[in-house]
């Protein structure tokens, strides 16, 4: 290699620059000049090459020497490779010859081994066949057949002529034993012979046909049940079902043509036969089959001790069978004729009775799915709804007779449906809806308005009609409750919300009765309020010469009105529980009005206070028609008796009353009573506010908070204090300081 040449060491950028300069200079010359210039450049290049060769002559000679030596080495290596290749061919020929010899010997040995195996297998088959012919025990025969199983299936042994007779005997014997075992299995299940069933299952296990045999057995059970269902749906007599062939796996059931329309004398006759047959099918035949399945499960548990495990385990067999039974029933219900579907829907309670009876006989080991009978519920519920509505059809004003018919139907339908909680809930919802319709019909007849509210005279025609409607509603409520009481035992056995649904449906009847009573009560309360307010016009309460014995005139009027209004307008209602509640509310309201009016009554003399004390006692007598036992009212009754003592107490005694939550008498009552002991300058709160007695009573009714009432009293006390200061009065009313002190204590006691 030539190195160190200045020209060669030029950078690419410098070379490009020289070329560009040369090209630029040549572009300005003529052709002849360009040729001369090129020739000159070529000559220079030639001289430079010669100079480089002279300078690098030694290096070039050394490189040429190395190239010759490398060529000689390559030639020597090629000769060595050729010698190795020839040696490899010789070794391959030697190995191939030996391998072919070994392979030929191996094939000979393999054929000898196959022949030996066939001879041993044939010998084993002949030996086992001889044992088979000499053995009588079925279980031992099955074990021998288990050993012969692979030999019989061996394809190579099938081509050996001298053992064909033995093979045919073994195959025939196996078939006979399987048929006999199948019959023994069926017989053992029918006769409840557990040992016989276990032996049959062991034999099938030795034949490796246990899975198939169990599947065939289940298929036979289902096929027999399917045929029984067809006979039942065809309307055949129960005797036909009783004579139907028992489970026989070895003999297939004879094929039957498609069902034809049953020749029925009457629909009633068909339904009687249908339900009798279906009950027998579920309650007896299916029970018998389930009992056999349970025995089969027990037998499988025993053979599992021998290490048998498969999909048809003792736990799986009952589940598979029951799933197939329910699938068959579901399919039969879906595909049965229209008249059978209608019969099933209308008699669903009978079907459920048979089904639940079967579950009880089986001790709950087999349970029907709730969804199985769901498609039939719609028709059954529709039939029940039609029966309910038939009682109300064409009746604009239901009476007790209508209610009796309605309850009679309800009791019948609920009694039939109580066998199943889901069905009972559905019927309860239908009952609630139809009961609402009955109440709606009665509600449409209720009279509202001024004429239906009057209480000053005997009940008019509208009020009599309202009372009659309320009594019909109560009769309906009472009849429903008696029905629920009669069915109480059945409701306890059937879990569900049916009882609660029916009980809640009575709330509308309570609401309507309350509506009728409420308008009368409002009129009574209004009249009582007017009568009690008249005590402010009672003559002589400020006189010391009035009589303190006997009731006041307003109290006599109140007693007469309460007695008359209760006996003429409220006592006529049959719902005594509701009227008792109304009586208590009226009594509490009457006491409240009386107390409010008494505590603001002023001025009062000592005789007047004694008269009011007597009026408190007469008030108890006046309330007897409303509440015979006033103690049931609780605090209002105690407050009335306390007022009979407070009204005659002095101001000093009044301010000693207990204050706070433990106090029987509210603080505002005591303060209002104290105003009655004060002079005219210390005006009552309503007088200060320019209110009438009526307005104050209304205000007290509308403001139940103790703080609001104390604030009203505070305004009156503040007004008195301001007036006293403005008039420069040196001495306050003697009651005023006691009132202020009591007021402050009451204010602090507020929560």
From Swiss-Prot:
Sequence segments annotated as region (Disordered): 1-21, 244-263
Domain of life: Eukaryota
Record's keyword terms, sorted: Developmental protein, Differentiation, Golgi apparatus, Membrane, Protein transport, Spermatogenesis, Transport
Membrane topology: Peripheral membrane protein
Membrane-spanning parts: none
Pfam families associated with the record: COG5_C (PF20649), COG5_N (PF10392)
The keyword Cytoplasm appears for this protein: no
Location of this chain's protein in the cell: Golgi apparatus membrane
GO biological process, one term: acrosome assembly
Keyword Protein transport: yes
GO CC aspect terms: endoplasmic reticulum exit site; Golgi apparatus; Golgi membrane; Golgi transport complex
Effect of inactivating the gene: Males are sterile.
Subunit note: Component of the conserved oligomeric Golgi complex which is composed of eight different subunits and is required for normal Golgi morphology and localization.
Protein family: Belongs to the COG5 family.
Functional description taken from the UniProt entry: Required for normal Golgi function and necessary during spermatogenesis. Required for cleavage furrow ingression during cytokinesis in dividing spermatocytes and for the extensive polarized cell growth that accompanies spermatid elongation.
Annotated protein name in UniProt: Conserved oligomeric Golgi complex subunit 5
Taxonomic source organism: Drosophila melanogaster
Gene name tied to this protein: fws
């Amino acid at each position: 290699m030539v190195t160190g040449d200045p020209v060669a060491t030029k950078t690419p950028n410098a070379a490009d620059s020289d070329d560009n300069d040369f090209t630029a200079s040549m572009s300005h010359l003529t052709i002849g000049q360009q040729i001369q210039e090129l020739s000159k450049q070529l000559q220079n290049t030639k001289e430079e090459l010669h100079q480089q060769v002279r300078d690098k002559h030694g290096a070039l000679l050394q490189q040429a020497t190395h190239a010759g030596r490398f060529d000689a080495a390559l030639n020597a290596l090629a000769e060595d490779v050729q010698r190795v290749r020839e040696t490899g061919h010789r070794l391959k020929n030697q190995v191939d010859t030996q391998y072919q010899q070994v392979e030929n010997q191996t094939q000979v040995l393999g054929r000898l081994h196959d022949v030996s195996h066939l001879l041993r297998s044939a010998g084993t088959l002949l030996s086992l066949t001889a044992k088979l012919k000499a053995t009588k025990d079925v279980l031992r025969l099955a074990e021998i057949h288990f050993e012969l199983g692979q030999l019989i299936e061996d394809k190579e042994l099938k081509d050996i002529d001298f053992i064909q007779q033995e093979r045919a005997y073994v195959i025939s014997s196996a078939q006979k034993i399987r048929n006999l075992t199948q019959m023994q299995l069926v017989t053992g299940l029918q006769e409840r012979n557990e040992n016989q069933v276990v032996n049959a299952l062991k034999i099938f296990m030795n034949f490796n046909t246990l899975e198939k045999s169990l599947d065939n057995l289940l298929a036979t059970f289902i096929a027999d049940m399917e045929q029984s269902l067809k006979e039942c749906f065809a309307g055949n007599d129960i005797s036909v079902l009783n004579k139907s062939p028992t489970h026989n796996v070895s003999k297939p059931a004879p094929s039957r043509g498609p069902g034809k329309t049953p020749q029925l004398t009457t629909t009633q006759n068909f339904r009687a036969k249908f339900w009798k047959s279906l009950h027998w099918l579920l309650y007896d035949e299916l029970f018998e089959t389930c009992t056999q399945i349970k025995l089969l499960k027990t037998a499988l548990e025993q053979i599992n001790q021998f290490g048998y495990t498969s999909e048809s385990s003792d736990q799986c067999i009952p589940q598979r069978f029951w799933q197939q039974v329910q699938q068959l029933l579901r399919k039969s219900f879906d595909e049965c004729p229209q008249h059978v579907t209608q019969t099933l829907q209308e008699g669903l309670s009978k079907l459920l009775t048979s089904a639940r009876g079967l579950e009880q006989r089986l001790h709950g080991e087999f349970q029907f799915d709730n969804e199985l009978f769901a498609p039939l519920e719609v028709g059954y519920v529709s039939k029940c709804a039609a029966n309910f509505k038939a009682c109300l059809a064409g009746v604009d004003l239901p009476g007790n007779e209508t209610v009796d018919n309605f309850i009679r139907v309800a009791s019948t339908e609920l009694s039939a449906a109580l066998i199943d909680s889901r069905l009972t809930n559905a019927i309860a919802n239908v009952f609630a809806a139809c009961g609402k319709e009955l109440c709606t019909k009665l509600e449409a007849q209720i009279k509202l308005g001024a004429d239906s509210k009057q209480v000053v005279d005997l009940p008019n025609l509208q009020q009599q009609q309202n009372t009659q409607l309320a009594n019909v509603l109560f009769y309906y409520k009472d009849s429903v409750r008696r029905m629920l009481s009669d069915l109480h035992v059945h409701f306890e056995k059937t879990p569900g919300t049916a009882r609660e649904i029916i009980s809640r449906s009575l709330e509308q009847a309570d609401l309507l009765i309350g509506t009728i009573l409420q308008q009368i009560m409002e009129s009574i309360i209004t009249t009582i309020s007017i009568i009690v307010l008249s005590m402010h016009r009672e003559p002589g309460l400020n006189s010391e010469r009035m009589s303190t014995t006997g009731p006041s005139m307003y109290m006599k009027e109140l007693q007469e009105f309460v007695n008359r209004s209760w006996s003429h307008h409220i006592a006529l209602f049959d719902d005594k529980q509701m009227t008792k509640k109304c009586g208590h509310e009226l009594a509490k309201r009457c006491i409240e009005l009386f107390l409010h009016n008494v505590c603001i009554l002023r001025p009062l003399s000592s005789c007047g206070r004694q008269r009011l004390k007597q009026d408190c006692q007469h008030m108890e007598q006046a309330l007897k028609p409303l509440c015979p036992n006033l103690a049931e009212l609780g605090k209002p009754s105690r407050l009335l008796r306390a007022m009979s003592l407070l009204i005659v107490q002095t101001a000093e005694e009044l301010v000693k009353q207990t204050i706070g939550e433990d106090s029987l008498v509210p603080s505002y009552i005591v303060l209002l009573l104290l105003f009655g002991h004060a002079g005219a300058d210390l005006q009552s709160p309503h007088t200060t506010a320019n209110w009438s007695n009526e307005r104050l009573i209304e205000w007290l009714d509308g403001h139940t908070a103790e703080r609001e009432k104390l604030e009203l009293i505070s305004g009156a006390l503040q007004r008195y204090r301001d007036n006293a200061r403005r008039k420069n009065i040196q001495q306050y009313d003697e009651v005023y300081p006691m009132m202020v002190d009591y007021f402050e204590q009451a204010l602090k006691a507020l929560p």
